[in-house]
Amino acid sequence: MIIETERLYLRPIAQTDLESVWAIYGDPQTHLFNPAGPYPDIAYAQAKLTSWLAEWSRNGFGNWAISLRSAPAEVIGCGGLSRRKVDETRNINLGYRFSTEVWGQGLATELAFAALDYGFEQLKLAEISATVRENHLASRRVLEKVGMLQVGSLAEEGHKIGSAVYTIVAERHRTMR
């Protein structure tokens, strides 16, 4: 299943994407708002990639390898929908991470719209959520641009900064498009 947007080419993540996953998730800059920090080594990236591949097999959706349509062989990010317990009632999570070289171009917003379209139109989901560090203003703006509303906050033991919980239901998404 491949999705193309105005500028993006999205395809299910594959084992051949390991080097790209490691380059993006091992970069400390892409983890400025993630207290867990960057992936420590390529073996850790492999373990994460293996879990993402299993999620595709189990659920029929998961992280996409994100490329520009003009260069579909070059992975510039990963993101999509995953089953992840957000809080007591929400378990479908929108997430994304892009290479620093493409930050500030509106690609996260374009990916978020595509993921929401896919989730509501193809998967027939009722609700999609996202969590973001409360101080990650750029990512919060992305979620707000696609119509997600903040519905709560999560405090995490050992972390000074909590996460904001955003959500959108299918009907609201239809009115945003």
Predicted regions and their residues:
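Acyl-donor (CoA/ACP) binding surface of acyl/acetyltransferases
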Residues: 1-32, 37, 50, 63-177
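Active-site rim helix/loop that mediates acceptor-substrate recognition in acyltransferases
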Residues: 38-60
